A protein has these predicted regions:
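Phosphate-end processing signature that detects enzymes handling 5′-triphosphorylated RNA
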Residues: 1-150
Length: 150
């Protein structure tokens, strides 16, 4: 979901700087390298299901040095963002504010128990973009937000 203003920042109980790149961006298996707060991660994601709401994901922690070395091998563009965590009722929203080639884009995500679960929508939440591939981080690294036509 897109966000239209930054009220979420004052509500955040946690925030992390995230730098990430992709060794592979094909939909069947996206391979991501991420550095988050001095920790490295290697993540493999499978295809998204038909509803666009879930997919297989495997992640392994690696050293930040290993992640830095692997980022050099990644396809352009590297994603740079701050993730804010905002609790609302029983749910935690992860709100990503992007920088660099994706500056100006803010996207929120909430993990649900099942696809039809009802959740409280905060006033700062905007348009629903779930399942729209252009908003996937892997696609933002390939077709950055600043290249989109309005």
């Amino acid at each position: 979901m897109k966000c239209y203003h930054d009220d979420f920042k004052t509500l955040a109980f946690n925030q992390n700087r995230i730098i990430q790149g992709y060794l592979s961006r094909i939909p069947e298996r996206t391979v991501r390298i991420r550095i988050r707060d001095e920790k490295g991660f290697l993540t493999i994601k499978g295809n998204t299901n038909k509803s666009g709401l879930s997919r297989f994901e495997w992640e392994k922690e690696i050293t930040s040095k290993e992640a830095e070395s692997l980022l050099i091998l990644c396809e352009p563009t590297i994603i740079d963002k701050i993730r804010y965590e905002v609790r609302l009722g029983q749910h935690v929203f992860e709100v990503d504010e992007f920088f660099g080639d994706n500056a100006g884009l803010i996207i929120a995500e909430v993990e649900l128990e099942h696809e039809t679960e009802i959740f409280e929508k905060p006033i700062w939440l905007g348009e629903e973009v779930t399942g729209q591939i252009k908003y996937y981080n892997s696609q933002l690294s390939k077709h950055p937000y600043n290249t989109w036509k309005s």
